[in-house]
Amino acid sequence: MIKMFASDLDGTLLNALHEADGTIRRAIRELTEAGLHVVPATGRSTLPIGEHGFTGLALDACCSNGSIVRDSHGEVLKTWTIDPQITEELLKAFPDICFDCSTPDGMFSSG
């Protein structure tokens, strides 16, 4: 028995306008009504489901290339992090390179 449906967002669940069209919304609604957990997966940081046309659907999400997993209420369930000491060493070793950092609270950049 299938219990979960996970799919990438951009170019898969979302169209060129970065929205889920009616066909996708109906399919996701049917999956959730059948009892499946539908999990959008994305490289984006924490995902605001509503802005992509999924308003009213209880969807969990796998964000930041899998490093943040949150439930349908936005509660962070699990994070996988890089040791802060390693991050500090990288910033010192490569001062001219821009680093991006995703956290459950948002995105941060070194430059």
Residue ranges of model-derived segments:
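Detector for methionine-enriched segments
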Residues: 1-4, 107
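Active-site phosphate-binding/coordination module
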Residues: 18-111
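Asp-based phosphoryl-transfer active-site loop
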Residues: 3-18, 40
